Swiss-Prot record:
Membrane-spanning ranges: none
UniProt keyword rRNA-binding, yes or no: no
Pathways per UniProt: Amino-acid biosynthesis; L-arginine biosynthesis; L-arginine from L-ornithine and carbamoyl phosphate: step 2/3
Quaternary assembly: Homotetramer.
GO cellular component: cytoplasm
Name of this chain's protein: Argininosuccinate synthase
């Protein structure tokens, strides 16, 4: 494994490159061809909301010198993994109760496996991509690539000293393309970087690295700038239906195709700016980073799913769902979505939690993450209003005498707890003085 990462261009050999059609990968592909490698270009169709013409990307790769260029449709698999993440609650990062839906890690899990599988079909066993050494993606792609092809070698132009010396910046790469006859005009550089797929968009870096720079500099690509009072956003009533843990209908319209359902959920949530969040997170290498995230469809489905979870399952099941979801979210973030420990947690949630989730949730969406749940319907609900009704109920499930007995049984653990607190007070762990949290503890 020590020779897995190649620090110099493998001349005369096939090199697969994850090709986006942007400046970096265009310049890298042309440079590799000129330096003697045989580049093969692979483009993932992940339903990116900011991509207009996927079919044009492989043609562009061929023009830059690719031996062959393929467009790999990853949307169905991405939809499948996105729904699995919702079923498991695989989201470990949140601020103020608003989660980051791990949309980039989900995209990397799909891209890293499906592109390398396509390379294997072409007998391409060297892979390059645009991830940098400071980020998470370099490790995610490394893991998923080697899981898919254990014989894979990794070559990244951005880790090659010669490439960096010759084409180390955007200006140098643009001039390189122009000098080689390509009419390349650099786009106006934004104040931040954006990466997206069908499930969500990530905005980070540059100006957003400063915590004093707020979300308002971001131009949403999956919805509206809900903070702008000039943007008219009308309240909207929406229904979301699940069957056996799978979202199947929106506003009464059934979808046989998960991709189409997610795209419609994006449109609905996007009209309100639902699912946008500002997060500080810990990267895989433990350094903190900051990102602004969009995920309107994931947010809509997650809200409805969790409402059904709380109405159907008991407290202990919900607790395990949440704890395991945090663990699984972190594994997903680290590029371990297909590791045994992740598969174990996924199977647990999908079998014992998701299978019972059948029903319809009605919501009113307003601006941003402001919403109201209007109704929750399910044949599997264990919520029954009459069980705890404050009104007099015929044939009540329990009466005052029953509760007296239940409370009397609590005397055992209350007595044990008081004894333990007394021990803690005697040893100095707790103070029994007047202003203490437990001022009366020392009294008999």
């Amino acid at each position: 494994m020590s020779n897995t990462i190649l620090q110099n261009l493998p001349k005369g050999q096939k090199v697969g490159i994850a090709f986006s059609g942007g400046l970096d990968t265009s310049a890298a592909l042309l440079w590799m061809r000129q330096k003697g490698a045989v580049p093969y270009a692979y483009t993932a169709n992940l339903g990116q909301p900011d991509e207009d013409d996927y079919n044009a990307i492989p043609k562009k790769a061929m023009a830059y010198g690719a031996e062959n260029a393929r467009l790999i449709d990853c949307r169905a698999q991405l939809a499948h993994e996105g729904i699995a993440a919702i079923q498991c609650g695989a989201f470990h990062i949140s601020t103020g109760g608003i989660p980051y839906f791990n949309t980039t890690p989900l995209g990397r899990a799909v891209t890293g496996t499906m592109l390398v599988a396509a390379m294997k079909e072409d007998d391409v066993n060297i892979w390059g991509d645009g991830s940098t050494f400071k980020g998470n993606d370099i490790e995610r792609f490394y893991r998923y690539g080697l899981l898919t092809n254990p014989n894979l070698k990794i070559y990244k132009p951005w880790l090659d000293v010669q490439f960096i010396e010759e084409l180390g910046g955007r200006l140098e790469m643009s001039q390189f393309l122009i000098e080689n006859g390509f009419d390349y005009k650099m786009s106006v550089e934004k104040a931040y970087s954006t990466d997206s797929n069908m499930l969500g968009a990530t905005h980070e870096a540059k100006d957003l690295e400063q915590l004093s720079t707020g979300m308002k500099i971001v131009k949403p690509i999956m919805g509206v700038a809900f903070w702008d009072e000039k943007v008219e956003i009308k309240p909207e009533t929406v229904t979301v239906t699940f069957e056996d843990g799978v979202p199947v209908a929106l506003n009464g319209k059934h979808f046989d195709n998960a991709v189409d359902l997610i795209l419609e959920a994006n449109r609905i949530g996007g009209r309100h700016g639902l699912g946008m969040s500002d997060q500080i997170e810990n990267r895989i290498i433990e350094a903190k980073s900051r990102g602004i995230y969009e995920a309107p469809g994931m947010a809509l489905l997650h809200i409805a799913y969790e409402r059904l979870v709380t109405g159907i399952h008991n407290e202990d099941t919900i607790e395990q769902y949440r704890i395991n979801g945090i663990r699984l979210g972190r594994l997903l973030y680290q590029g371990r979505w297909f590791d045994p420990q992740a598969l174990m947690l996924r199977e647990t949630a999908q079998r014992w939690v998701a299978k019972a989730i059948t029903g319809t949730v009605t919501l009113e969406l307003r601006r941003g993450n402001d919403f109201t749940i209007l109704n929750t319907e399910s044949p599997n609900l264990t919520y029954e209003a009459e069980r705890l009704s404050m009104e007099k109920v015929e044939d009540a499930p329990f009466d005052p005498i029953d509760r007296i007995g239940q409370l009397t049984m609590r005397n055992l653990d209350v007595s044990d707890t008081r004894g333990k607190l007394g021990i803690y007070a005697q040893t100095g762990l707790l103070s029994a003085i007047k202003d203490s949290v437990l001022p009366q503890l020392g009294k008999k």
